[in-house]
Amino acid sequence: MPYYNRKEYPKQIWVSEIPEREVSLLRENLAGIKQTTFVLIKKEEAFHQLSEKRSRDIIFLSSNQSLLDLARDVDVPAIAYQKPEMDTFLHADMVVEGFEEVDMTFLQRVYERHFNIPWTILETKRCIVRELELSDLDALFSMYAEPGMTDYMEGLYEYEEELEYQKAYIENMYRFYGYGMWLVFEKKTGTLIGRAGVEHREELNGDMELGYAIRTSFQHQGYAYEVCQAIMQYAGEELQVHLLHCLIQKENALSEKLAIKLGFSYCGDREIDGVLMSDYQIEW
């Protein structure tokens, strides 16, 4: 069974060559966090410690490119602080110009991305929504093999081709955009029960589409509504997206019913790849 909710945290946050004002702001954002230790470290000591210590427990923050390069060389996730007066652009796992929004969730996601750990996007009462990782493929194929799963959507490629497709998707969608189609797991059992998420569509002039599919054996239990509501809230709050489409095949009455229940309205038809689709939209 896949790891449906695997979270990992850095145990230590090392900070070097960061202005005191920004350090104070970072400390304030991390107040009350118990699972991680905050370590303020001088440049010379940082060079020594990073050279000596190859550890998966650390995330490193600095404005010094030589230190950031050393962190990269010893496989330590790093965040660069780009000072306003700097002429050259720093390089690291992430570059920030301030620490106003750098909290534990931000640090955790930089850490997880560095070590190729799938992000947990959100939780609902009964479900976990997280990014796909390659070890999920067997469970994904099992889900798609259930009767009725591909009645109104495309199936998967052959296994090796799907593997290559998902490798590219992880690299080009998750890493670049930070969103896409995610996996839905039932908390109680850890079972993969669906896919849902948001993607840009060329056919929609770059607008975002909400997509969803629930495993046949888990349909008619309210999972799609529960998960899609949470994703719509996430899209608004985290992605600043306030217009979504649902493209639904004409014969898919259940999906149309769900879209209407979620607040979408029918706005016309679109032919996509030779298939007539109903375009439902919501704006908030």
Stretch-by-stretch model annotation:
Residues 169-183, 194:
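A short helix-loop-beta-strand connector motif used in the catalytic cores of GNAT acetyltransferases and
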Residues 2-9, 28, 32-38, 47-58, ...:
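Acyl-donor (CoA/ACP) binding surface of acyl/acetyltransferases
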Residues 23, 162, 228:
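Aromatic/hydrophobic pocket-lining residues that form the small-molecule binding cavity
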Residues 45-47, 162-163:
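Short alpha-helical segment
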Residues 148-169, 179:
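Conserved GNAT-fold acetyl-CoA-binding loop/helix
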Residues 6-20:
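Short hydrophobic beta-strand segments
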Residues 14, 59-62:
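Structural motif
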